[in-house]
Amino acid sequence: MSRHPEVKWAQRIDKVYITVQLADAKDAKVNLEPEGVFSFSATAGTDGNLYESKLELNDKVNVEESKISVGVRSIFCIVEKAEAKWWKKLVRDDQKAPHFVKVDWDKWVDEDDDGADVNVDGMDFSNFGGMGGMGGMGGMGDMMGGMGGMGGMGGMAEMMGGMGGMGGMGGMDEFEDESDDEEEVSKPQDAEKAAEAGKSQESDAKTETS
């Protein structure tokens, strides 16, 4: 059986801020319809519990201009109203707000004040309209998974491993060893030549004496 995540909301004359409080949400899907239907589903917790909620918002919305940001602790949505006016509550006037929907006092301003927009610096947003709802975010998982194909870079590791054949440059040592061997082999020949030269000098000396 699914559970309901806590949903907080605040508004400005032209937009609504909706925050779904759910830490470490997995497979999150958020859908927004022009008529104002907002639906959410995701799994969370060590047991992978399913969390769902569906709200019929107070009025129509502009899906194309609305944005969503998925964080570690929550999913934050900026829903643009189709008509710039203040809503009496988040859901339709003929409905009672669910128990899990609460006012986000940190972002709330009174209608008379209509303060500045909420500071969203540091948040990464995606457009609802361009993504067909956050369900499209799953596509990002696939895309990132595809980048796992970067594991194909392991092929580079193999290629580089093949360059380990450069270790064959160690063959240079073999060349050096061979040249050393040649030097060592030539030394006895030099000794023999020296001995022959010595004998020749001795015979010359005997000839001169005689």
Curated annotation (Swiss-Prot):
GO terms for cellular component: cytosol; nucleus. Residues 2-91 form the CS domain. Residues 185-210 have a biased composition (Basic and acidic residues). Induction: Up-regulated in the leaf sheaths of rice plants grown from seeds that were inoculated with the nonpathogenic P.fluorescens strain KH-1. One of its GO terms (biological process) is response to stress. InterPro entries: CS_dom, HSP20-like_chaperone, p23-like. It comes from the Eukaryota. GO terms for molecular function: Hsp90 protein binding; protein-folding chaperone binding. SUPFAM superfamilies: HSP20-like chaperones (SSF49764). Residues 165-210 are annotated as: Disordered. Residues 173-184 have a biased composition (Acidic residues). Belongs to the p23/wos2 family. This is Uncharacterized protein OsI_027940. It comes from Oryza sativa subsp. indica (Rice).
